[in-house]
Amino acid sequence: MLGVQLDGNLEHSGGPIMSDQIDQMLGLKTWAIVGLSNNSERAAFGVAKLLIEKGHQVIPVHPKAETVHGQKGYEKLSDVPFPIDVVDIFVNSDLAGEVVDSAIAINAKGVWLQLDVIDQSAVERAENAGLIAVMNRCPAIEYRKRP
């Protein structure tokens, strides 16, 4: 069952997220970060910077369509004119399902719901559509765990 509670952390269907799944996601190049703006106080800003430092192409997706870290922003996922590998979701859990549905519609390879962004049914939809799904984790934290 999706969202099994283990040691206080919401986990991936079937138990803890396997390290190879996270490695697979971290190995994908183009990340759209939904909720990324120029607000340097927000976690998305720092995560985007780290992803760029790790060699990823980062695409800001935000209603303001701001350029962030020198990367052109877009208002919504469907506005991005090239393929996106991972949709990293930095929005309220109530909005996450809509973003996951957009990720499915644009044929993303994976969705990453950030810490405290919880939507079990959206993750199920993503997995049923063939996407890799990670929920309640942070790629910056996962990178720091790796050599």
State what each model feature region is.
Residues 56, 106-110, 129-131:
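A short helix->loop->beta-strand "cap" motif at the edges of active sites that frequently abuts
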Residues 4-17:
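Short, Lys/Arg-enriched N-terminal segments with co-localized hydrophobic residues
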Residues 37-42, 49-69:
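NAD(P)-binding Rossmann-fold cofactor-contacting core
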Residues 32-34:
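Conserved beta-strand elements of the Class I
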Residues 68-71, 85, 121-124, 142-147:
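Short, charged, surface-exposed secondary-structure boundary motifs
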Residues 57-64, 69-86, 94:
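Helix-adjacent hinge/juxtasegments
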Residues 115-143:
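Rossmann-fold NAD(P)-binding glycine/threonine-rich loop
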Residues 77-117:
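Mid-chain, well-packed structural core segment of small domains
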